């Protein structure tokens, strides 16, 4: 039995894992148990506790669907097996033109295999908006023209964090410092355009930027 700790909030993904379990059982006699979690940080905490207790074999977690923040935490705490990715039969099918060698700017070093591709996509109704903003600068102008309409999910919700990451990348023209470990010396300078933008945006955002949606719905 393989215990796979993964977010359980998508019915489509849950259905896929149930299908994968049936395939594994019929072809290899292996049972895949989907351990549904709300936040993968729960699994990070569990692994740290098991390691501290000296439980180096027979633990409760075999595989984990992990995000960049928790990948870095697990890597720093030496909780990950590997490197292993080049031993995977499917590795040759992975599109190496994608940034599979880093996660949230943290080098993966073969300790993490791609599970999917996450992209921030803005969707609009062409019947009501036929000329949508094509940049964050245009989005700010749109928000000022139509106040109290736009917002973003409150970080650390994934889409809210992704919104801010994409914003700071555009505003700084992908400053090289953003791909390095953060330090106090350049943080204020590099991120200044972000805070200036948000100060302007929040003035005209939904509920004046005092409240934020909890998710994307």
Please report, for each region that a protein language model flagged, where it lies by residue:
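Early extracytoplasmic/lumenal segment of secretory-pathway proteins
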Residues: 1-73
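Structural recognition of the beta-strand scaffold that forms the well-ordered cores
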Residues: 3-6, 33-36, 62-65, 114, ...
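Extracytoplasmic/periplasmic solute-binding protein
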Residues: 5-6, 107-113, 120, 144-178
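Extracytoplasmic
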Residues: 27-29, 42, 108, 117-119, ...
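Sec/Tat-exported extracytoplasmic proteins
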Residues: 27-28, 51-55, 68, 75-78, ...
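A structural signal for short loop-to-beta-strand junctions that line the ligand-binding cleft
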Residues: 52-66, 76, 80-126
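Flexible hinge/capping segments at coil-to-helix
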Residues: 129-145
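Ligand-binding pocket segment of bilobal, Venus flytrap-like solute-binding proteins
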Residues: 151-152, 159-217
């Amino acid at each position: 039995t393989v215990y796979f700790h993964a977010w359980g909030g998508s019915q489509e993904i849950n259905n896929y894992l149930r299908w994968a379990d049936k395939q594994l059982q019929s072809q290899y006699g292996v049972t895949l148990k989907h351990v549904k979690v709300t936040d993968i940080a729960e699994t990070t905490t569990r692994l740290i506790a098991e390691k501290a207790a000296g439980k180096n074999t027979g633990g409760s977690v075999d595989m984990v669907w992990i995000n960049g923040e928790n990948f870095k935490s697990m890597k720093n705490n030496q909780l990950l097996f590997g490197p292993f990715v080049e031993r995977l039969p499917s590795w040759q099918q992975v599109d190496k033109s994608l940034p599979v060698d880093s996660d949230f700017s943290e080098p993966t070093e073969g300790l993490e295999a791609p599970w999917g591709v996450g992209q921030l996509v803005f969707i609009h109704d062409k019947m009501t908006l036929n000329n949508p903003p094509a940049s964050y600068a245009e989005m700010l102008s749109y928000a000022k023209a139509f106040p109290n309409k736009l917002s973003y999910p409150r970080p650390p919700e994934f889409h809210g964090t992704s919104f801010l990451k994409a914003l700071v990348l555009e505003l700084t023209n992908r400053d090289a410092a953003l791909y390095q470990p953060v330090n106090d010396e350049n943080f204020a300078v590099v991120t200044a355009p972000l805070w200036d933008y948000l100060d302007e945006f929040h003035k005209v955002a939904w509920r004046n930027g005092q409240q934020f949606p909890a998710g994307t719905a």
